Amino acid sequence: MARFGTQKLYIDGGYVDAGSDATFEAINPATGEVLAHVQRATQADVEKAVESAERGQKIWAAMTAMQRSRILRRAVDILRERNDELAMLETLDTGKSYSETRYVDIVTGADVLEYYAGLVPAIEGEQIPLRESSFVYTRREPLGVTVGIGAWNYPIQIALWKSAPALAAGNAMIFKPSEVTSLTTLKLAEIYTEAGLPDGVFNVLTGSGREVGTWLTEHPRIEKVSFTGGTTTGKKVMASASSSSLKEVTMELGGKSPLIICADADLDKAADIAMMANFYSSGQVCTNGTRVFIPAQMKAAFEAKIAERVARIRAGNPEDENTNFGPLVSFQHMESVLGYIAKGKQEGARVLCGGERLTEGDFAKGAFVAPTVFTDCTDDMTIVKEEIFGPVMSILTYETEEEVIRRANDTEYGLAAGVCTNDITRAHRIIHKLEAGICWINAWGESPAEMPVGGYKQSGVGRENGISSLAQYTRIKSVQVELGGYSSVF
């Protein structure tokens, strides 16, 4: 019997059975254990969720800003009280180390919710004078029922990133988590209800993107879709959302981000940054800086520092807080990553570290891939051009600043970029020329609630987090008021 039994849908403030008996398995990628049987939503369930969300949204939007803010703050408190429990569930479901989920996933998700809870009373319109007897005022009104579609790498954090601004602005949200990692999002729905959110304002439908996701994106009474995932799927979601009813969309998609290390950089610090940009969360982060550019004359010294740090990685049971490198999210994804590693070897890249599946002892039960570093890479290699979404670093050399900027930008993606240098002028000069939406100087990876995140080119549309995201969950109504007489031309 599965450890967590059968997981139902969450609609209208409670768990309900799906309209069919179909389920899918939630699997612990560290051991292969079946954690739960998760029900698949039907099209009829989607209709129930939309109707429930419409009812709840009217109640929610009619509350005062302070009432909504207090409920969201209460949810923040509950998230923090249950942090360790939720973190362990996230570890079991995703394979991410508990040392990561305990201090990052729920913590940063709660921070975003707290940030938007504080902004609820700040949603304001404007007053625009026209003449002595007339003025215009604007209202920022909620969109209505919105949809969030999450990725498998940060399940509860992404659910909070999407629901926080949506709910703060007075909307309802129907959330569809990834089929691979659905469990913590259902717990989030419980927490919202416990905090006092009206029934229906946050519903969770589990199932495949091909079915449930499409039913949601095509639904005529959904006003906005926020999607996190791959670029190919994102294009389909965007086409579906726009062709059905011209929905607004936010897309956080793939990346193949460059990390440029300059000749004057502190090489130890640069190596530490490169490690975080490639191996945190076992390399399953959309913003990973997998193309590491190093001046040719510094390549050997940099390789030595990277190899030394890779040797210190503590791969193992993700439930052990001493572990800092767990398995990949699924056995299917492991095969995809191993395929890219094989391609890298075939195309002539040299393996500096790793390059294989970990199979010794308990590793054999899980989807573990060794932290892998390729060097002697060229821009035309598959591992350099395509998003792998795993623990695979590619080291490339360059000669001039102009050259490395051109090569860094030579990609269909534009999600993130970073520069390591002690020259502040050079740092800003390079960053301003890089075609990426999220950039770091002498750092990598932090995405605080206040920081808008999103991509250029085929890495996304719109932004999440920051004040600008809140505006994307409202629409402006303009009202002209005439205090004096009115003249007709007829």
Swiss-Prot record:
Cofactor note: Binds 2 potassium ions per subunit.
Gene3D superfamilies: Aldehyde Dehydrogenase, Chain A, domain 1, Aldehyde Dehydrogenase, Chain A, domain 2
Record field: transmembrane: none
Signal peptide boundaries: none
Active site location: 162, 252, 286, 464
Highest taxon listed in the record's lineage: Bacteria
Catalysed reactions, as listed in the record: betaine aldehyde + NAD(+) + H2O = glycine betaine + NADH + 2 H(+)
Pathway: Amine and polyamine biosynthesis; betaine biosynthesis via choline pathway; betaine from betaine aldehyde: step 1/1
Modified residues (Cysteine sulfenic acid (-SOH)): 286
UniProt cofactor(s): K(+)
Enzyme class: oxidoreductase
Keywords: Metal-binding, NAD, NADP, Oxidation, Oxidoreductase, Potassium
Cross-referenced PROSITE patterns: ALDEHYDE_DEHYDR_CYS, ALDEHYDE_DEHYDR_GLU
Site (Seems to be a necessary countercharge to the potassium cations): 248
GO biological process per UniProt: glycine betaine biosynthetic process from choline
Binding site for K(+) 1: 27, 93, 180
Listed GO MF terms: betaine-aldehyde dehydrogenase (NAD+) activity; metal ion binding
Subunit and partners: Dimer of dimers.
NCBIfam families assigned: BADH, PRK13252.1
Family membership: Belongs to the aldehyde dehydrogenase family.
Name of the featured protein: Betaine aldehyde dehydrogenase
Gene name of this polypeptide: betB
